[in-house]
Amino acid sequence: MNLYHRPASLFVAEFIGSPKMNLLSGHLLRAEENYALVRIGGHEISVAVDARHLQMGAQVQVGVRPEHIAVAGSGGGAGILSHLHHLERLGDSSLLYVRVGVDQPITTVKVDGSSQALFGSALTLRLLPEHLHLFDSQGMACRRTLELPI
């Protein structure tokens, strides 16, 4: 479980887990000891990592597992507008495949099975900083500064 929750590289992050980790491309805006601020499209996302070794403006990837994304109304965190591309019902859960921007891959969101989302509907996604990962241009993970128990 340690590799799943604390991948040291993009390779490990994408290899372990099904559905796989979502990766969103962005640029580093700010790096402090306890967090980094990343621009993804028109959104600024806070990530609980130490990225001080990276240069401002560096190309980075923000990683988030499908079960660590909430749909609007489910709590705080950064909001990203998306549109539902496909819904896969699995019984007790559903997978929402959403598009968060023309330059981003389809993002997978795991929700409970009672989701009533409709194709093409607009959804606001909540990304909580403590569940996000940050990978540099070489695919190496930045050290997380807020560790949740696993």
Pin down the residues of each PLM region.
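Non-catalytic connector elements of ABC transporters
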Residues: 19-150
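ABC ATPase "signature
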Residues: 5-9, 31
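Short acidic-hydrophobic catalytic motif
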Residues: 1-5, 13-16
